[in-house]
Amino acid sequence: MEGFLSWEEYNFSAGPAVLPEEVLKEAADEMLDYKGTGMSVMEMSHRSKAYDEIIKEAEKDIRDLMNIPDNYKVLFLQGGASQQFAAVPMNLMKNKKAAYIITGQWAKKAYQEAQIYGEAVAVASSADKTFSYIPDCSDLDIPEDADYVYICENNTIYGTKFKELPNTKGKDLVADVSSCFLSEPVDVSKYGVIYGGVQKNIGPAGVVISIIREDLITEDVLEGTPTMLKWKTQADADSLYNTPPCYGIYICGKVFKWIKKMGGLEAMKAHNEKKAKILYDFLDQSKMFKGTVEPKDRSLMNVPFVTGNAELDAKFVKEAKAAGLENLKGHRTVGGMRASIYNAMPIEGVEKLVEFMKKFEAENA
């Protein structure tokens, strides 16, 4: 399919992950000389006119893609999503209380980090069934004085996704969208904060994008909050308070343009749904491989599956790699297999995976 990978190795890594071939080729062409500047973006001053154009254009393009309202700031930051686990309570815990919905390891880590700074209340959890579903969030017992409600919208390890946002009862919603960023349309106005590491669906590791409603960016932060973790510091400096991850942002900008070229977020959603259906349909009829997530909560991005036999799982991963299907081993905390099928994964990659799974099943029945 035009715009996607054309070689025979398919990378199903959960992140850092597959990038569009077109983007990689453009970056290679510009590696030694970016648009006649005589230098690589890697060498370029972040205060230069050329780089100023790169970061401003990247912001414009993500605003266009997500239809981000004018009263939201877009920040290109460092420290990954994990650093935002601390930045969120530091910037938002006015009453030193927040509600967390625990649907996997990353939501749990964010919840544990927030407990350092105030009272983090777990208002729902799917830990009772190994995070294999999304709990009902239509009528949560949210403390009246909670400053925000926090979710990890797509759970990379366990393969679940919020299909409907929780009823926050008027509280600001904060969402870690690291593994579903730009995979489908989103109504930004329903969130107070959206953030995510880019290394799954948007670019190379080293950049986190935070989209924050302006009224939440204030000087009123927890005492002792480091200057670099104050959103106001970064917002006032347009993400240039210190040297940003210049090259990573440059690649993100190219991915934004690629998504636009492919038809925007509606087209990405259709593409991702088609890929996921191919894989889930096979899992639902297979006698050997089983999905681990309740069907209504299945992620379009991360698909975990097992054979039920650890030795057979290991054999599958080894033979899949030899067949050009890379990085299918499940997360170290859960085992089994996981296929991450982000935006840049072509349909052909999923078709080849299913073809191999059928062959493996026949040979190992």
Task: List each model region and its residues.
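Conserved PLP-binding catalytic core of the aspartate aminotransferase-like
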Residues: 289-320
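Active-site C-terminal subdomain of aminotransferase-like
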Residues: 20, 198-280, 294, 363-365
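A glycine-/small-polar-enriched, mobile loop at the entrance of the PLP active site in fold-type I
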Residues: 8-59
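Conserved N-terminal alpha-helix of the aminotransferase class I/II PLP-enzyme fold
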Residues: 39-84, 91, 105, 113
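PLP-dependent enzyme catalytic core of the Aspartate aminotransferase-like
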Residues: 3-9, 322, 335-365
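Active-site phosphate-binding strand-loop segment of PLP-dependent enzymes
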Residues: 15, 114, 125-181
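PLP-dependent aminotransferase-like
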Residues: 82-149
